[in-house]
Amino acid sequence: MTVQFIGDGNPDGTILQNLEAIRGDAAERRGGVLTTPPTATGTTTLTAAQMTGGVLVATPAAVATYTTLTGTLLEAALHDDIDDDDTFDLCIINLGGAGDIITLAGGTDVSIIGSATVDDAGADINSSGVFRFRRTTDNTFVAYRIA
């Protein structure tokens, strides 16, 4: 799996780093590789693959809470070169039925800023949510709802 960091803490913000060792693949340098996205159903603690895959396809059959990894486990899942202010995105797409709302909850040392709910596909509003996770210090992350 490849996750691309949006920023690296440098003021110019031009450096993009991959979570895995850079393969030298030109397509990867332009935007990464998206394989078949991981999935989730009912209430769960997300795995590293679900959090860092870029896209998570959800099919809950009822109201569900998806809890992030703890800050310590999330940092362990990322590459060794992660720095303060590095970021990665997670898009949750909710394909659940009417009323099957997902709430993203932060594990220990992970805070959510903005709306943490991803409404069902039948709702009048978006049934997906994009969260930008930013490392603030060792083993600590903030997830911003950006879309």
At which residue positions do the language-model features occur?
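Short proline/glycine- and polar residue-rich coil/turn motifs
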Residues: 119-125
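N-terminal accessory interaction module
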Residues: 3, 7-9
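Short aromatic-acidic-glycine turn motif
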Residues: 109-119
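Exposed extracellular interaction/assembly regions and N-terminal maturation sites
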Residues: 3, 15-111, 125-126, 135-147
